[in-house]
Amino acid sequence: MNPPPLPRRNPIASFFVGLWDVMNFTRRLILNLVFFGVLVLVLIVMMVAMGKGASSAKILQDRTTLVIAPEGRLVEQYSTDPVSRALAKAVGDNNAEEIQLRDLIRAIEAARDDKKIERVVLELDKLQPSGFASMREVAAALQDLRASGKQLVAFSENMGQSQYLLAAQADEVYLDPMGSLLLEGLGRYRQYFRSGLQDKLGVDVHLFKVGEYKSAAEPYVLDAASPQAKEADLFWMNDVWQRYLGDIARARKLDAAQLAAGIDTLPEGIAAAGGDLARFALQ
């Protein structure tokens, strides 16, 4: 049995249905053309960029000087994603800048092995204070670079302890005449809230702990560090500081005890230099 024939549309309905089909086809055609046009444009831009990158790649000449200017603090792994790092850099948030330790060491090792690189210049102005263990790894890589026969030159307008540990490995160290080099030792500063919490706000804090060397909750029950906390902090800080002084003394061929004595008399040394921190650094 044949199905019943479909009812025929009236001419007006047929006109609008046909018009709709034409509009729908035109819309899809335009969208497809736009999509493929954008796709082709992106491909062209990528090809041009790759071509320019390949053509603009500089070929190292003999006796090349490589400038290494780390910006930020040394980390084992980035703490944020690439988008967040790009946004932070775009808004000028320099405190958020990080350098992966392995990237910096690889750059130093590549310079060591490249026969066309004659010297390396370290610009340390934007290197932020970093972990001592990481700084020692970089210092060891710089020592290997010098041992390979490459000249190492360090420059900075101002140097703190992190920057100077790396600069000390260089053949030559340059400091801005208006700059400074301060080695002040290690310290730890914590805030204590007992007076504010108990005396002013009336907050009672009940601390339960096992053992004397448990200082995590001390800020809530004391106004200053306990003798046990000071002893524990001094134990590890003295060890780190002695290692730091030893590294500096070996790199600069100095006596570690004499170096420590100069740091212990820092105010007197600055006064003897007339307040000129750069001249004091030369002493």
Feature roles, as predicted:
Residues 2-270:
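Small-residue-centered hinge/linker elements
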